[in-house]
């Protein structure tokens, strides 16, 4: 197999030639024997529980099943490293090579790659300039296609023929005195026909011709020509050949990526890919045998079609025709199913890797937090900052080594919390909420240690994360290097991200829980029980009574207050009722105010009707404004 570079800039996916596929899996042993071709459908011998030679788990092709041990047991232990056993042909090496060593299957007949045939758009159909329906009829042995019309007047290149039409022309050709001259393979069927048509394409010449046609073409025809030219240009740019879309050699992925494990009852659980590969090998071997004994054409053709369907199911089960199902009528997972989708290799394992120094928990409101702070559970913090805590414990001489420090942390020694407090002081953490749709989906906060297991979040930053507190989860990441910490503090701190980068409008706005809390706090409940007129000399006295439980949050109270007063939305003040008192003092009473004035109209005292909730809200706002 070709050696891969240790350092590279990017991964490029392209078409592989049959020679390249064989190169991936082929190795030459010291005795000159070439191994790599999988020829048997067997997997593991049920008596010895060892992989069968030349089978899907062959140790000669893929490497030893046990570290430093050959198949026959002649060589064991690491001292025989690199030796190839002369008896069984297995190289003595680590078993992990079975995760990257590949094999291959030489197909007895070519088959089309289902991605290029049934993809949208179909690249094979685009390149051949044929309707997809016609290409499918040829591939699945329902129609012949003319690949060389010879001197026939009534035949054209790429014309489709039924079985009867093909036989009729064959009869005409061999009639006495017939002038019809056609080459031996003038019409073909199956993937061989598609391969022949693709081989005949001269990419450079075709591209030049298409460019000329595009200049004069209009409308739908022009769009079709441009689409075809784009595909041809891509083939030229990548140095790929069109006939490589038809497979003559099928790669077999490493056995440890399609494992077979023994269960408790002695039964085996296996990857679906092994069943799909087994179907391909069985049909391929049967086809090779039929060709060898020169079986009737109809039987050979049927076997070729079945081989095509088996390879289709292996690459992309269900893309065309009936889905191949296993036990319990469950569709088998093909190579495409393993790659694509949310649980596929790309999204699950490459884009969504597990990360060190990270945690995840449910978010709850942190009402006592500042905007740049988040509440980090102690249990999570000690795990995330463990290396920093261990370093500090050793530096202070509290413990002598890492093992003792870990033991101290596991035993929840009270000293570790003081050290942890010091470690997290000024060390920001990153909070991320999936899906991270814009820059503000991940922000930095200064952690504050809290009890419990939930991450506490300031409600003002919720709109940026599109978070609410109905069970949302967030991930915590610890920036380790000083550069990362500086970047988190300067660029990502929540207090530095007040405006939306998309619109420039403020994104730090009260929402959801804050709005609901403010509404509930200041709401006037008309159905609150009437507890009679309660009078308080000051706002503070009213709050003391509320704290002691003498009055409720929405109880109507009269409070002595000399500042301005605004009515809420929908609230109207009634006409004042005037009561004359001794000494010329007048008392004006409305449904919201009681004002006592002297003879000159100067206010002696004012009582307003409010609720403890509104007093709390007013006091909070006043305190912030005067701070």
From Swiss-Prot:
This is DNA-directed RNA polymerase subunit gamma. HAMAP family: RNApol_bact_RpoC1. The keyword Transferase applies. Its cofactor is Mg(2+); Zn(2+). Belongs to the RNA polymerase beta' chain family. RpoC1 subfamily. Transmembrane segments: none annotated. In cyanobacteria the RNAP catalytic core is composed of 2 alpha, 1 beta, 1 beta', 1 gamma and 1 omega subunit. When a sigma factor is associated with the core the holoenzyme is formed, which can initiate transcription. One of its GO terms (biological process) is DNA-templated transcription.
